Swiss-Prot record:
GN (gene name): rpoA
Protein name, as recorded: DNA-directed RNA polymerase subunit alpha
This enzyme's EC code(s): 2.7.7.6
Origin species: Populus trichocarpa
Pfam families: RNA_pol_A_bac, RNA_pol_A_CTD, RNA_pol_L
InterPro entries in the cross-refs: DNA-dir_RNA_pol_insert, DNA-dir_RNA_pol_RpoA/D/Rpb3, DNA-dir_RpoA, RBP11-like, RNAP_asu_C, RNApol_insert_sf
Family, as annotated: Belongs to the RNA polymerase alpha chain family.
Length: 339
């Protein structure tokens, strides 16, 4: 049987923007690459990034309109070309950029005739309109239009209850999604066991964020989601004394990792799962039951630790050492002592 050799790439991951353009004030496009990645990693990152880009990034929207002169949403006002429903839909499309939190007030106060556009909205100082030309309404007669607005910052899609309030305010379904679309694709290169991958990310935004800003924010949000796992408390296992236990030298694998460059190789070791080591089924199952899933998990255990695993024998430890004798591919100094 030919054993597949597992190699670790010590090359630092790098990303860059390979294409960037603004098709309009409300449509930005960016294309990015990340490489080199091990087989399977590009899809893992690409799927997570796409979900984070579309669902985890916050946006600012108009969520409510208020006017005492409006009897109901589907009514019309003399002198205004659009129905109230059409005006609400136009307000829904207004693209805003801000760092505010909570609910803030804005307003429209215009005298006709003329066109009402986004530039006629009176906003808080911290809010910016991306496209001042966005149409809201057309006033055909010399009438006064006064609309109170509420602005919120949130994420995802927020469907307001259909109920209208007695004060003449109307809720607006808000799409707090600065990223219009995101796609990823994978390019493989290399031969045989040396295959690596390049991740391509395409991002379209509504102009309130650039694709690069969206990529940074999505990355930070993903990191924040995983940080709790890094601070999880280790469980303390109290093992009963066993008179038949074999006493082994207190050699800890992690003592041999002192020469590694932690920022690169530690991450690489955590990316190699014990599934790739072609272990015997019994050994594999024992390790998995002991929450040893990666090469990094394995190397943190001493020989004595491994012998404490239920149903584990000295021959099993030797078998693991036999597999890890491909040490030159891990650049790790393994023990030379015999059992």
């Amino acid at each position: 049987m030919v054993r597949e050799k597992v190699r670790i790439s010590t090359r630092t991951l790098q990303w860059k923007c390979v294409e960037s353009r603004a098709d309009s004030k409300r449509l930005y496009y960016g294309r990015f690459i990340l490489s080199p990645l091990m087989k399977g990693q590009a899809d893992t990152i690409g799927i997570a990034m796409r979900r984070a880009l579309l669902g985890e990034i916050e946006g600012t929207c108009i969520t409510r309109a208020k006017s005492k002169k409006i009897p109901h949403e589907f009514s019309t006002i003399t002198g205004i070309q659009e129905s109230i429903h059409e005006i609400l839909m136009n307000l829904k499309e207004i693209v805003l950029r801000s760092n505010l939190y909570g609910t803030h007030d804005a307003s429209i106060c215009v005298k006709g005739p003329g066109c009402v556009t986004a530039q006629d909205i009176i906003l808080p100082p911290s809010v910016e309109i991306i496209d001042n030309t966005q149409h809201i309404a057309s006033l055909r007669e010399p009438i006064d239009l006064h609309i109170g607005l509420e602005i919120e910052r949130n994420r995802g899609y927020c469907m307001k209850p259909p109920k209208n309030f007695q004060d003449g305010s109307y809720s607006i379904d808000a799409v707090f999604m600065p990223v219009r679309n995101a796609n990823h694709s994978v390019h493989s290169y290399g031969n045989g066991n040396e295959k690596q991958e390049i991740l391509f990310l395409e991002i379209w935004t509504n102009g309130s964020l650039t694709p690069k800003e969206a990529l940074h924010e999505a990355s930070r949000n993903l990191i924040d989601l995983f940080i709790p796992f890094l601070h999880a408390e280790e469980e303390n296992f109290h093992l009963e004394k066993n008179q038949h236990k074999i006493t082994l030298p207190l050699f800890a694998f992690h003592d041999r990792l002192a020469k590694l460059r932690k920022n690169q190789k530690e991450i690489a070791l955590k990316s190699i799962f014990i599934d790739q080591l072609e272990l015997a089924p019994k050994i594999y199952n024992c390790l998995k039951r002991s929450n040893i899933h990666t090469l990094w998990d394995l190397l943190k255990n001493s020989q004595e630790d491994l012998m404490k695993i239920e149903h584990f024998r000295i021959e099993d430890v030797k078998h693991i050492f036999g597999i890890l004798k491909i040490e030159k591919h891990f650049t790790i100094n393994l023990p030379k002592n015999k059992f």
